[in-house]
UniProtKB/Swiss-Prot annotation:
Function: Catalyzes the attachment of L-aspartate to tRNA(Asp) in a two-step reaction: L-aspartate is first activated by ATP to form Asp-AMP and then transferred to the acceptor end of tRNA(Asp).
Major enzyme class: ligase
A Pfam family the protein falls into: tRNA_anti-codon
Compartments, as annotated in UniProt: Cytoplasm
GO MF term set: aspartate-tRNA ligase activity; ATP binding; nucleic acid binding
Protein name listed in UniProt: Aspartate--tRNA ligase
Family per similarity comment: Belongs to the class-II aminoacyl-tRNA synthetase family. Type 1 subfamily.
Recorded catalytic activity of this chain's protein: tRNA(Asp) + L-aspartate + ATP = L-aspartyl-tRNA(Asp) + AMP + diphosphate
Length: 576
């Protein structure tokens, strides 16, 4: 609580001119003009300029103050001669009469004012200094505002903010678990939750009906620019709402965010595509619709006779673009290498000039009306699933190379009607073994085909995609034990394994379970998108490196033998 003479920096304006104020903060920048000293004082609200004149009895002492020293100052608000329109306090400055050093800073390992220019390793090791940079701090302040907006939307819809345990049980959710050994039960382990999935379903069984929390989740998986081993999600579960109602609620959350964070309107309802449509049009289940390229079927324009069947092994699909001048021979060779190396596919390209098709397969084109002059066409042929996946990746690359993405727009859409199961052919497990595309608690759209044709089953699942990022995923859940046990059986779980790992859930489903479903929104990704950064580490206070290390804490680290003995653990290998 501030005293009546104290202010945050950004509260001060010309209406305070002549007032004596007390301010506290960090010395951010300083300039010595001989008979006058100028300092920038930074607090959590912003920056204000301090003026120290030569007649100040502390002048010599103040001149020696190092950057990032924490001070308290007393001074008078005066009008600034050279105003700074880029600062909220740019019309005023503080004529300092007294300064007290609260904590002196040593020589800094990085320049706080320009910390983004330091090596990432240095920034992460001294993250508490990096976070002093106002631009870096802005990411976390926005994170707060985003979280608060979501919370307010849910509270006005009668949701309860409830917690779930961190020490949990290992369950299959698609990634490796972080395990915590038990001292009391030697040889047994807790698992850090990959999500609060089962607990939030138990809340519904307990009759709470509307739950949410800002949940911490942990997944031991390979990292990338938008993924960390621990992350936050807005976890939501409801009873008695159908899929459309949950999606509508989620849209309300996002619309409120656009209004509160960007002061922009957002139209509802969002576009919806089925999983099949998304792959056939864009080659991805999380397409960036700011990219105008769509996969087109050109098969009917080709003469697929016996001879050409040696070249075309199925449907002929691809893209056509008009920016031919930007595509060099080297770039075309790079594209061909991509398809051959990663997908064992042959990429064909041809261009239309002066009403004539030029390219290696022009003799097979029986109708060139699909192509305009100066347009280039890229096509591949093969099995549908393979060419869609390949073209989806190529679509992103081609749009990036040709600057086709309209970055002034925001593209949100739903992907629905996912398959309930998938098969992973590369796996060493038995062929055609089924795996849950989302998780094994997702309700099927039609449970009657589970026994006869489970591969054709669709899921009551929905993903929210924003500019090519999956920012949310949810589903309706199974609410009877018979269907849940059948799903486990189809996934290859033995009865004993089901009982050991999910017996509590099967038991709970027997005592009256409301129809329920929910969604989890990736908070880190949402903040990343709202702050227009490409690196998720920017929006996390203390992130890990790409190799899952905390450089500041030097974690993970070895523990001493006494700790291992207490847990009755013995290391199999010495990795030091």
């Amino acid at each position: 609580m501030k005293t009546k003479y104290s202010y945050y920096n950004n509260q001060l304006t010309l209406i305070h001119q002549g007032k004596i104020v007390f301010l506290k903060g960090f010395i951010f920048r300083k300039r010595n003009l001989g008979k006058t000293l100028f300092f920038d004082l930074r607090d959590v609200s912003g920056i204000v300029q301090l003026l120290v004149k030569e007649n100040n009895p502390q002048y010599d002492k103040i001149a020696l103050i190092k950057l990032e020293t924490v001070v308290q100052i007393k001074g008078q608000v005066i009008e600034r001669i050279n105003k700074n329109p880029d600062l909220p306090t740019g019309d005023i400055e503080i004529l300092v009469s007294h300064i007290e050093i609260l904590s002196e800073a040593q020589t800094l390992p990085l320049n706080v004012f320009q910390s983004q220019e330091s090596l990432e390793e240095t920034r992460l090791k001294y993250r508490y200094l990096d976070l002093r940079n106002p631009e870096v701090k802005h990411f976390l302040i926005q994170r707060h505002h985003i979280t608060q907006s979501i919370r307010q939307t849910l509270l006005k819809n009668d949701f309860l903010e409830l917690e779930t345990p961190i020490l949990s049980k290992s369950t299959p959710e698609g990634a490796r678990d972080y395990l915590v050994p038990s001292r009391i039960y030697p040889g047994n382990f807790y698992a850090l939750p990959q999500s609060p999935q089962l607990f939030k379903q138990l809340y519904m069984i307990a009759g709470f009906e509307r739950y949410f929390q800002v949940a911490r989740c942990f997944r031991d998986e390979d990292l990338r620019s938008d993924r960390q081993p621990e992350f936050s999600q807005i976890d939501i579960e409801t009873s008695f709402l159908n899929q459309d109602e949950i999606m509508s609620l989620t849209e309300e959350i996002i619309v409120d965010l656009f209004a509160n964070i960007w002061k922009k309107p957002l139209l509802q309802p969002f576009l919806r595509l089925t999983y099949q449509q998304a792959f056939e049009l864009y080659g991805s289940d999380k397409p960036d619709l700011r990219n105008p390229l769509k996969i087109t079927d050109f098969t009917t324009f080709f003469d697929t006779n016996t001879y050409s069947q040696n070249i075309f092994a199925g449907k002929i699909k691809g893209f056509k673009v008009s920016k031919t001048a930007f595509l060099t021979r080297r770039k075309l060779d790079e594209y061909q290498l991509f398809f051959s190396k990663h997908f064992n596919l042959k990429l064909f390209s041809f261009v239309k000039k002066n009403d004539k098709i030029i390219g290696g397969i022009s003799q097979f084109i029986q109708d060139d009306s699909f192509l305009k002059n100066e347009e280039i066409c890229f096509v591949v042929s093969g099995k549908k699933d393979i060419i869609h996946k390949a073209l989806g990746i190529f679509r992103t690359k081609l749009a990036l190379d040709l600057s086709l993405v309209d970055t002034t727009q925001e593209a949100l859409l739903w992907i629905v009607d996912f398959p309930l199961f998938e098969t992973i052919q590369e796996d060493l497990s038995p062929p055609n073994r089924l795996y849950s595309l989302h998780h094994p608690f997702t309700a099927p759209r039609d449970a009657t085909i589970l026994k006869s044709n489970p591969q054709k089953a669709l899921a009551n699942a929905y993903d929210l995609v924003w500019n090519g990022y999956e920012v949310g995923g949810g589903s309706l859940r199974i609410n009877n034990h018979q269907t849940q046990e059948l799903i486990f059986s189809l996934l290859g779980f033995l009865q004993e394994e089901v009982q050991n790992r999910f017996g509590f859930l099967i038991e709970a489903l027997k005592y009256g379970t409301p129809p329920h479903g929910g969604i989890a929104l990736g908070l880190d990704r949402l903040v990343m998108l709202f702050t227009k950064t490409n690196n998720i580490k920017d929006v996390i206070a203390f992130p890990k490196t790409q190799s899952a290390k905390d450089l500041m804490l030097e974690a993970p680290s070895a523990v001493n033998q006494e700790q291992l003995n207490t847990l009755k653990l013995q290391l199999k290998c010495n990795f030091n």
